[in-house]
Amino acid sequence: MIAQEYKKMLGAKSVIREMFTYGTERAKEIGKENVFDYSLGNPSVPVPEKFTKKMIELLETESPVALHGYSPSLGIDSVREAVAVSLEKRFGLPYKKEHIFMCSGAAAALAHAFRAVTVPGDSILTFAPFFPEYNPYVNLTGAKLKVVPPDLKGFQIDFEKFETMLTNDVTAVLINTPNNPSGIVYTTETVKELARIMEKKAAEYGHEIYLISDEPYREIVF
């Protein structure tokens, strides 16, 4: 028997998915060049030529087992080291290999992060509007996703509502900037005030409140 909760989740309506399916079917009818698909986040920008050449080189010279086999649980050491060096260079923070956990995509990374900082009965706080798949990722941990209503003036954070909802059961705050679906980027002032309130509440409750920052669109600039 299929669990009813999972069956309900799989059967939930997704307007974005419906738009994508419709766009795919229309492309077959009138040609792909005549369909502008703004549904799923599939970037159309080509990958850097340097990356493509390196992939071809590895396919032609490396052992298939090394390329396609299992990696260590935390990721290949040399890759983790390279990511740490890149992050330190770009953001000026003291990242080390030990801080890096490689995942197969952002969804897996979020699922691991949620599981790492919650136990059943805890809550994670995020802000509307938000990526709807956060809900099942959090629910699978036994925790609950609580949503702070949006600041409709500028889609930054309504700090009065945020502080009210940052209760003792909240173990993590999830932000997404640039935001999906609004495209809003949080200002420096917004992030600093967010951190101030989180630190104050963590001291008040006597436990850590972690900040999880989902940034898949950070590198995309128009």
Predicted features and spans:
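Conserved core of the PLP fold type I
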Residues: 65-206, 212, 218-220
